[in-house]
């Protein structure tokens, strides 16, 4: 399935006139930035919200996100100049940057100490150039003039960085002659984009951004291969309200104590289980840092009947057994493992430990909470499959109001359980985020949970069309106006609160609609 190309904006599910006005404003700013250049095409990719299944994608367990209407758009001019110039409609926060091109298409060095938005574009340049080489399309990269526009909140947990990287990669490839790329290939090459800026992403964000379809959510699987499978919800008046807590979560700057530390803790937890269960070489070293993964541990435990990712009942049974194993093998050290305790269990020297776990990405910690992290991964993965089972059983029943209400209550409870684990086991929530969830549940939400990396960012709320207004008003009154008394209502409704249907994924847009 290829990334689509559209000649108009009819694929947008939100206000068509508002959308066209946004594109026309982008054209106006592009022409102001580059008066002697014309736009050849647009590339775009949306943000995403994860409905359930956080901090499990990099352990290769399936997740359930959807693409949202908020997206990153880039207007592109292709030329033969030896440079790429990137600009943004928000020039105050994203200043103009020029990236010189060399004959060898190298030199895209990323200064991890300099947190510039150009670093993310360079990530896209690296993966796009690698793909061109892989496809035997190696040649001098085209010069480009680009103006970006994005309405995915930065640091809001809605994958603004993934949307930017995917849109940038798609633009670079299209400019350099790749007019037809599969969704699978675009996902595969962009999954590693943010690794170049030191953020250890797992693949869900990029896959959801690429594979999104209108009115459909996505089951994203990582084994046996990375793929997105669209599906519809059985309740017609179901909707999701996404609220930005306005606590900015900068993954790059906080990664050593948050996101990357979870990756390391889960990797060590997997290796500790390998040792305790005597699994030896049955577990592949396939994590992002070259260690065992918690999915690999489960597959090794059930080596003769590995879960294929499709049979929901088998997956549920195996995950329940893995939760019991975690309770048996790791529960005796809930306060956390010291490095010395890890060395003893893993039979490693300090230098070997540092080389294996602490070299790939910087982390800071006092103790490593292996029990909590492993338990979260297996319980959260179980909830994803329980949601799938709920979807499959509801879709085969009648569509009465009682059935709809039953589905909403059950799915909401799974989301609430997820939030509890994210708070207590993964420790990626905080008091203010918990407060938002509590307020929402009192004002029409069936289930509310943080989404994305956490530690700030956004909350996703399950509700219905007839309750969404009450929910939004309750959050404005009891959270936003108390925490941010000077904030304007129109700013909230435009930037902090999104009521989004599942939306179209990555695509190219021609300039025909401008004619």
From Swiss-Prot:
Catalytic site: 205 (proton acceptor)
EC top class, as a word: transferase
NCBIfam families: gal_kin
GO CC annotations on file: cytosol
Transmembrane segments: none
Protein name, UniProt field: Galactokinase
E.C. no: 2.7.1.6
Molecular function terms, GO-annotated: ATP binding; galactokinase activity
Function per UniProt: Galactokinase is a key enzyme in the galactose metabolism where it catalyzes the conversion of alpha-D-galactose to galactose 1-phosphate. Can also induce the transcription of the gal genes in response to the organism being challenged with galactose as the sole source of carbon.
Site residues, Transition state stabilizer: 48
Superkingdom of origin organism: Eukaryota
Reaction(s) catalysed by this chain's protein: alpha-D-galactose + ATP = alpha-D-galactose 1-phosphate + ADP + H(+)
Keywords: ATP-binding, Carbohydrate metabolism, Galactose metabolism, Kinase, Nucleotide-binding, Transferase
Residues reported to bind ATP: 155, 157, 159-160, 249-251
PANTHER family: GALACTOKINASE-RELATED, MEVALONATE KINASE/GALACTOKINASE
Metabolic or biological pathway: Carbohydrate metabolism; galactose metabolism
Matching Gene3D superfamilies: 1.20.1440.340, 3.30.230.10
GO BP: galactose metabolic process
Family from the record: Belongs to the GHMP kinase family. GalK subfamily.
Species, as recorded: Candida albicans
Keyword Nucleotide-binding recorded: yes
Keyword hit for Cytoplasm: no
InterPro entries cross-referenced by the UniProt entry: Galactokinase, Galactokinase_CS, GalKase_N, GHMP_kinase_C_dom, GHMP_kinase_C_sf, GHMP_kinase_N_dom, GHMP_knse_ATP-bd_CS, Mevalonate/galactokinase
Binding of alpha-D-galactose, residues: 48, 54-55, 57, 205, 259
């Amino acid at each position: 399935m290829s990334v689509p190309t559209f000649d108009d904006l009819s694929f947008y599910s939100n206000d068509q006139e508002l959308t066209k006005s946004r594109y026309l404003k982008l054209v106006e700013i592009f022409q102001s930035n580059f008066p002697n250049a014309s736009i050849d095409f647009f590339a775009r990719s949306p943000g995403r919200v994860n409905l359930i299944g956080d901090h499990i994608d990099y352990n290769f367990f399936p997740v359930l996100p959807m693409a949202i209407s908020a997206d990153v758009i880039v207007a592109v001019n292709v030329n033969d100049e030896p440079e790429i110039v990137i600009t943004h409609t928000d020039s105050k926060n994203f200043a103009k940057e020029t990236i010189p091109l060399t004959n060898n298409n190298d030199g895209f060095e990323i200064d991890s100490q300099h947190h510039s938005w150009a670093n993310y574009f360079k990530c896209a340049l690296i993966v796009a150039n690698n793909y061109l080489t892989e496809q035997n399309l190696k040649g001098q990269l085209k010069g480009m003039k680009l103006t970006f526009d994005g309405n995915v909140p930065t640091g809001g947990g809605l994958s603004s960085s993934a949307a930017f990287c995917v849109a940038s990669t798609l633009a670079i490839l299209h400019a350099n002659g790749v007019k037809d790329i599969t969704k699978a290939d675009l996902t595969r090459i962009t999954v590693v984009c943010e690794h170049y800026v030191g953020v250890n992403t797992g693949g869900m964000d990029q896959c959801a951004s690429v594979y999104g379809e209108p009115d459909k959510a996505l089951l994203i699987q990582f084994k046996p291969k990375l793929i997105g499978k669209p599906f519809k919800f059985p309740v017609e008046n179901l909707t999701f309200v996404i609220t930005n807590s306005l606590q900015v979560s900068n993954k790059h700057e906080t990664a050593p104590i948050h996101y990357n530390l979870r990756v390391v803790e889960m990797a060590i937890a997997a290796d500790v289980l390998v040792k305790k269960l005597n699994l030896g070489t049955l577990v592949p070293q396939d994590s992002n840092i070259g260690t065992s993964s918690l999915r690999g541990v489960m597959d090794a435990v059930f080596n003769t009947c590995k879960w294929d990712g499709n049979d929901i009942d088998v997956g549920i049974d195996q995950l329940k057994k893995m939760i019991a194993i975690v309770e048996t093998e790791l529960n005796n050290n809930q306060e956390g493992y010291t490095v010395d305790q890890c060395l003893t269990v893993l039979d490693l020297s300090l230098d070997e430990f540092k080389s294996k776990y602490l070299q790939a990405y910087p982390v800071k910690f006092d103790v490593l909470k292996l029990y909590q992290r492993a338990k979260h991964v297996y319980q959260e993965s179980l909830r994803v499959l329980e949601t799938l089972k709920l979807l499959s059983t509801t879709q085969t029943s009648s569509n009465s109001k009682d059935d709809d209400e039953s589905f909403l209550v059950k799915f909401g409870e799974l989301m609430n359980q997820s939030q509890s684990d994210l708070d207590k086991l993964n420790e990626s929530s905080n008091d203010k985020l918990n407060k938002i969830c509590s307020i929402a549940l009192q004002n029409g939400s069936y289930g509310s949970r943080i989404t994305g990396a956490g530690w700030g960012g956004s909350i996703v709320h399950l509700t219905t069309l007839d309750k969404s207004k009450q929910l939004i008003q309750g959050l404005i009154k009891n959270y936003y106006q108390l925490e941010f008394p000077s904030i304007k209502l129109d700013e909230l409704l435009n930037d902090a609160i999104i009521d989004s249907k599942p939306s179209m994924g990555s695509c190219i847009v021609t300039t025909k609609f401008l004619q």
